[in-house]
Amino acid sequence: MTNKVTEIPKEFQVSPIVCDRYLVDGELKTWKGNTTEVYSTIQTPNQEGKLAPTLLGTIPDMETPAALEALKAAEKAYQRGQGIWPTMRVGERLKCMETFVEKMKAHREEIVKLLMWEICKNKSDSYKEFDRTIDYIVDTIEGYKNLDRKGAKFDKQGGV
């Protein structure tokens, strides 16, 4: 049996994704340096018609200056525990996480397809993996809410 791209159902075929942006200091910046190609172990015909790993896309090949810029931005954001995120009110932090989950859910199909290609999970297992991840984040949010509620309660001890 020979494998051909045409044998892969259209809804599961992929086009390479070019990732030429990176996040530093709350800003998406355009990467102009070298990139690294990301391949699937699933083989499809290459330009010469020979079976080869399938190109999924490219990612920035972050070099020392960009990495140090990211480190400096992280230090600035944290500010020894006095930055925006560590001092943000619980409700605001939870809202950020809930927004992240909703945005992630909007990309479910795309992420599931990439899981299938990148780590060779079948469709059903890829959906389960995605859904488990969402459930874990939601459960963590709920756990944090419960922890915050417990911390806001006062216990009476000895009538006081």
What does each model-found stretch correspond to?
Residues 65-74, 94-109, 123-150, 154, ...:
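Long amphipathic alpha-helix in the N-terminal Rossmann-like dinucleotide-binding domain
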Residues 57, 159-160:
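Glycine-centered structural positions embedded in regular secondary structure
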Residues 1-117:
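Short, structured beta/alpha segment
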Residues 116, 120-124:
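Alpha-helical hairpins and coiled-coil heptad-repeat segments
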